[in-house]
Design a protein with these regions (language model features):
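Short, surface-exposed linear patches
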Residues: 41-46, 56-59, 82, 99-101, ...
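Active-site flanking residues adjacent to catalytic metal/cofactor-binding acidic residues
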Residues: 21-23, 37, 80, 105, ...
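Conserved catalytic-core segments centered on acid/base and nucleophilic motifs
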Residues: 67, 77, 81-86, 92-96
């Protein structure tokens, strides 16, 4: 799904029976996610609180660049405000594509990065001609 709309997350087109993985949601996971993967569950340095896991969600400590799941294990993969922190974003995306059939990636806007820069952000990510560009 490609959207430039800041509220695009409200219409992810996740089907009722889809199995959903969310990578790195921290303190704000989507209720619809079935599995939560977080690389640093005990380090709240870059989030606004402790990792939140709803009762119906399974939690796994995992790096988005090396996910412990089989190919196509999920119908949908969500990565919200995480990719800009990745050591190797290309590997991270390869893993998302490997384990999921469809997905959603949201990153901070260029304006947001200029107005509120964060040291923990390794990348500024733009969508140019339907391609993600990292710098």
């Amino acid at each position: 799904m490609i959207t430039r709309h800041p509220l695009g997350r409200q219409d992810l087109r996740i089907k009722r029976r889809d199995k959903v993985l969310e990578i790195g949601p921290g303190h704000d996971p989507m209720f619809r996610s079935d599995v939560i993967a977080d690389k640093f569950p005990h380090d709240d340095t870059h989030r606004c609180g402790k990792v939140l896991i709803y009762p119906h969600q399974q939690f796994i400590e995992a790096d988005g660049e090396q996910l412990p799941f089989e190919k196509d294990a999920f119908d949908y993969v969500i990565c919200n405000q995480v990719l800009e922190h990745a050591d190797n974003p290309a590997r991270f995306i390869e893993e998302m594509v490997r384990v999921g059939k469809r997905g959603y990636v949201e990153t901070p806007s260029m304006l947001g990065e200029q107005m509120f820069p964060k040291e923990s952000h390794r990348w500024v990510i733009l969508l140019i001609e339907d391609k993600l560009v990292f710098y």
